[in-house]
């Protein structure tokens, strides 16, 4: 921290050396902040350019690298069966919905995918998009009416906007996971599955107990396609008891 200087400059201007220093300090802080933003943006761009899943998503026609996470989890747990019904909460930009539509046969067979988001989402062949808040009490009923049946899987890749404070980010994303689970309880058919993003630290005790009471099998998984530095995990619950 710079020491305060005596105002020994010309009294005619009304600006002392101390005022000039403070202005200089403020300007340097602005420059440092601007540089930090530029460096952060550069690092993000470098990470994107060097990420094999970003390149693969462009090549394979997926809207986001997140598509490979649900592909990996489905390869292991077999969520998507041809002719089944899936609900994607917080679906934009649509990577998970794309995978669900492909694997359920939503374009040609009797598979059905409902994608829900409060943001706009570009249309996807075989996907029925609903622009609404899934927290609305009537949302599960609206989706059931649209699909004409209950879902085989309810999935959510939602995360709250990051604040940089780890505990706050964890709690906010956990709140979304809990709300998604309650939606699933209303929308799933017996034997169905639930998959949602959480952060390291795992699922809260209350939610974990609810899931264990409602499903036959509950576990966590971090897909290989998740970035190594990411704190995300996925809670996977199968064999819904109804």
Model-derived regions: residue spans:
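Conserved SAM-binding loop of SAM-dependent methyltransferases across substrates and taxa
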Residues: 93-108
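Glycine/threonine-rich flexible loop motifs
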Residues: 162-173
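Conserved class I S-adenosyl-L-methionine
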Residues: 81-92
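Short glycine-dipeptide loop
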Residues: 83, 107-110, 188-193
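A short glycine-rich, Lys/Arg-flanked "PGG" loop and its adjoining helix->strand segment in the class I
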Residues: 174-190
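S-adenosyl-L-methionine
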Residues: 109-112, 116-163
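Class I S-adenosyl-L-methionine
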Residues: 200-242
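Class I SAM-dependent methyltransferase Rossmann-like catalytic core
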Residues: 2-82, 101
């Amino acid at each position: 921290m710079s020491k305060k200087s005596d105002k020994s400059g010309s009294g005619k201007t009304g600006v002392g050396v101390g005022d000039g220093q403070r202005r200089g300090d403020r300007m340097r802080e602005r420059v440092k902040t601007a540089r930090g933003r530029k460096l952060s943006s550069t690092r993000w761009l470098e990470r994107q350019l060097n990420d094999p899943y970003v390149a693969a998503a462009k090549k394979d026609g997926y809207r986001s690298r997140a598509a490979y996470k649900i592909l990996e989890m489905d390869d292991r747990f077999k969520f998507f069966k041809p002719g089944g019904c899936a609900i994607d909460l917080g679906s934009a930009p649509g990577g998970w919905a794309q995978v669900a539509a492909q694997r359920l046969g939503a374009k040609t067979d009797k598979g059905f995918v409902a994608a829900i988001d409060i943001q706009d989402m570009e249309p996807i062949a075989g996907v029925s998009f609903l622009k609404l808040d899934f927290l609305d009490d009537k949302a599960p009923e609206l989706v059931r009416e649209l699909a004409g049946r209950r879902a085989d899987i309810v999935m959510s890749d939602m995360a709250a906007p990051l604040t940089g404070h780890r505990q706050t980010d964890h709690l906010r994303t956990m709140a979304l996971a809990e709300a998604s689970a309650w939606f699933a309880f209303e929308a799933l058919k017996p034997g169905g599955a639930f998959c949602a993003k959480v952060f390291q630290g795992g699922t809260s005790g209350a939610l974990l107990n609810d899931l264990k009471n409602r499903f036959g099998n509950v576990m966590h998984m971090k897909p290989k396609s998740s970035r190594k530095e990411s704190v995300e995990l996925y809670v996977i619950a199968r064999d819904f008891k109804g």
